[in-house]
Structures are given as structure tokens and as C-alpha cells.
UniProtKB/Swiss-Prot annotation:
PANTHER family: ELONGATION FACTOR TU, MITOCHONDRIAL, ELONGATION FACTOR TU-RELATED. Residues 19-26 are annotated as: G1. The lineage of its organism: Bacteria, Bacillati, Actinomycetota, Actinomycetes, Mycobacteriales. GTP hydrolase that promotes the GTP-dependent binding of aminoacyl-tRNA to the A-site of ribosomes during protein biosynthesis. Belongs to the TRAFAC class translation factor GTPase superfamily. Classic translation factor GTPase family. EF-Tu/EF-1A subfamily. This is Elongation factor Tu.
Length: 396
């Protein structure tokens, strides 16, 4: 059998802080780790503000993003929390999916109310499919006027409702700074916020519960046994003797049966999301399958050539293009394991797209790719990444 699995006793949830610059996202992240450390010292280590603020650089689909990860636990759950300090970092994270969120804490300063970036972050959260948002009304210690607090709360609820988020979501009045300083009233406010996070953010759908999908990375023949495809299982579970479909790149898809699952040269009964496996396929020749295709539960994923995407185009400083692009731009779109050339149509009224922009585009690929809404891709020119995006709507 394969190695012992990492045992998690609690549900694992990915969350993040979003909101306007200087409204206190990073301070709140530090306050949460401190308050939970003090409340459950055996479960949590404390993290200083500057450890979180000096966010390390990460590369995701060829794009550099500054992003901080902290972990903490409540009695109920284990959380991984991401904080992207800069506005551009947040946008890049959301579009490239460097850190996906099961829910978000929208930080709004009670002293300012919602600001332009607050709206933009909520809109992006909607577009990239963040399932739930609740609100931390930060700097509430600095506002004495109850009516003003209620007004800001109402504005925030209207903003959530406008993007079809739950307008009855918890809005918790906090002071991250005072909580960090240990003021008991405001420490309690952060505890209340985390209770609200525990209660209101739904348990995520586990990847293993979704229909099976594995992108093909490599194909080879084992003499006397047949053709093996290797890759990392993206979602779901595959059992020996189950039927699968090979989809994408070719004009038609092929059905076959998995006669063996291998991991670390050991035979398994099943492979599941996250495993790097080899699948032995019945009656399939080496030339019947290629990198860039996906192996899926039959009928669950279809190949498409036309879609609308939401994209971020790298600036020159990030190693992107030095010049804008126009209608009929023809880069490669890198989906999962392979590049496919596509022709870009810009939205009505957009003449060109500048390096550093984020925009929506329509794309027509020269080969079909197995895709669902939300699938991420990189935009490349001769192997160099010039942008990243996600499928927002499948056209054909």
C-alpha cells in the first residue's frame, strides 16, 4: 500500500482577507493569529505583523505575486489564510488562482466605509467564484457615532447584495490594532469574528467528491501490458476496472477502461485527487492519446474551442510584453499541460490591451480543449508567459 495519509481531524478551509489598501487587512490577519494563539496556545503559533506584511514572492503560471500564508485553528476548523498586501497582488492572485479561497473576510474601515478597491475586490471575488464573504468592520474603536457605524454597515451590505453575495452575512465590528495591543473588549471582537467565520463560511466541497479528471502529462507503452498515461489526479477518485473517457485536442473522444492504477511503482486499487499516478488503459495504442488531453469520468467534461476569458496581462516590469496587443492577436493558451494557439477578439469598444491591464477577451482555439467554467490558463508567446486568465463563459 501507499504511504500513510496525512490525518486531518478537522475540516480544512482556505480563506483570505480582501479589501481596500490601508483598511487593515494585514493587521487583522496578525490580530487573528495572536488572538487564536492566546485562546488555544496548543493549536496555534503567533505571527508578528511584519512576518505577514513582508509577503514572500511566489510564482504562479509565470507571474510573480507577493502573498502571505498563515495557518491557524479554531476548535471547529483548520484554516489556511492568505493575505495579498498590494492591490495588484490581490488581482493577480484572484485571476491566476495562486491561492483559492473557500470564503473571504472583507475588511472595511469604519472610518472610511467602502472605497473603490473595496468594490473591485468584491466584484473580482464574484467573478472568480469565491463562495462566501463576511465583513470585518475594522477601526470601529475610532468611530463613536453609532449611527455612522450603522450607515457604513448598510453600505457594505448593499455592496455585497449588488454582487449577489449574502447581504445578511455577519458584519463584525473589530479593531485589529487594539486586539493586537491586548485590549480585552477588542480581543473579544476578533474572537466573535472567528466564530462568525466558523459558522457562516460553508464547508468546501472536497476535491475527491467531484467527478474524476486527470490531465495527461506523459504516455508510454509497457511491453505485454499496454499503454500507461501518467499525471496528477486533479479531482475525484478512479478505481480499477472503471470506464473513462479521453477528451480534448483530437476531434473525437475515446472511451476505455482503467485496468491498473500505479503510484510509486506500487499497484493500487484506486487513485484520488492529489495523487501522481499511472493509469493502464485497455485497448489503447501509444498513438491514441497525447499530452494535453484529459482522462475523465465519461460524460462529465466536454472539449471546446471558443470561450470568454478574464485575463491579466503582465506589465513590462513583470517580464511581459513591451507593447499593447490588438484584435486578432494570436498567442498560445496553456491549459493544464499543453499550449494551444488561439485568436483573440477584444470586447466592443476596446481598441487595444496594454501590458498591466486586466480585461475580458473572447478566444477561438485551433484545437479543442476539455474545459469547464473557471478553468485557469496562461497566455504565452514562444514559451514565455505574458498573461494569465480563467474561463468565465464557454461559447462553443
Amino acid at each position: 500500500m501507499a504511504k500513510a495519509k496525512f490525518q486531518r481531524t478537522k475540516p480544512h478551509v482556505n480563506i483570505g482577507t480582501i479589501g481596500h489598501v490601508d483598511h487593515g487587512k494585514t493587521t487583522l490577519t496578525a490580530a487573528i493569529t495572536k488572538v487564536l494563539h492566546d485562546k488555544y496556545p496548543e493549536l496555534n503559533e503567533s505571527r508578528a505583523f511584519d512576518q505577514i506584511d513582508n509577503a514572500p514572492e511566489e510564482r504562479q503560471r509565470g507571474i510573480t505575486i507577493n502573498i502571505s500564508h498563515v495557518e491557524y485553528q479554531t476548535e471547529k476548523r483548520h484554516y489556511a489564510h492568505v493575505d495579498a498586501p498590494g492591490h495588484a497582488d490581490y488581482i493577480k492572485n484572484m485571476i491566476t488562482g495562486a491561492a483559492q479561497m473557500d470564503g473571504a473576510i472583507l475588511v472595511v474601515a469604519a472610518t472610511d466605509g467602502p472605497m473603490p478597491q473595496t468594490r473591485e475586490h468584491v466584484l473580482l471575488a464574484r467573478q472568480v467564484g469565491v463562495p462566501y464573504i463576511l465583513v470585518a468592520l475594522n477601526k470601529s474603536d475610532a468611530v463613536d457615532d453609532e449611527e455612522l457605524l450603522e450607515l457604513v454597515e448598510m453600505e457594505v451590505r448593499e455592496l455585497l447584495a449588488a454582487q449577489e453575495f449574502d447581504e445578511d452575512a455577519p458584519v463584525v465590528r473589530v479593531s485589529a490594532l487594539k486586539a493586537l495591543e491586548g485590549d480585552p473588549k477588542w480581543v473579544e471582537s476578533v474572537e466573535q469574528l472567528m466564530d462568525a467565520v466558523d459558522e457562516s463560511i460553508p464547508d468546501p466541497v472536497r476535491e475527491t467528491d467531484r467527478p474524476f479528471l486527470m490531465p495527461v502529462e506523459d504516455v508510454f507503452t509497457i511491453t505485454g501490458r499496454g499503454t500507461v498515461v501518467t499525471g496528477r489526479v486533479e479531482r475525484g477518485i478512479i478505481n480499477v476496472n472503471e470506464e473513462v473517457e479521453i477528451v480534448g485536442i483530437r476531434p473525437t473522444s475515446t472511451k476505455t477502461t482503467v485496468t491498473g492504477v500505479e503510484m510509486f511503482r506500487k499497484l493500487l486499487d484506486q487513485g484520488q485527487a492529489g495523487d501522481n499516478v499511472g493509469l493502464l488503459l485497455r485497448g489503447i495504442k501509444r498513438e491514441d492519446v497525447e499530452r494535453g488531453q484529459v482522462v475523465v469520468k465519461p460524460g462529465t467534461t466536454t472539449p471546446h474551442t471558443e470561450f470568454e476569458g478574464q485575463v491579466y496581462i503582465l506589465s513590462k516590469d513583470e517580464g511581459g510584453r513591451h507593447t499593447p496587443f490588438f484584435n486578432n492577436y494570436r498567442p498560445q493558451f496553456y491549459f493544464r499541460t499543453t499550449d494551444v494557439t488561439g485568436v483573440v477578439t477584444l470586447p466592443e469598444g476596446t481598441e487595444m490591451v496594454m501590458p498591466g491591464d486586466n480585461t475580458n477577451i473572447s478566444v477561438k482555439l485551433i484545437q479543442p480543449v476539455a474545459m469547464d467554467d473557471g478553468l485557469r490558463f496562461a497566455i504565452r508567446e514562444g514559451g514565455r508567459t505574458v498573461g494569465a486568465g480563467r474561463v468565465v463563459k464557454i461559447i462553443k
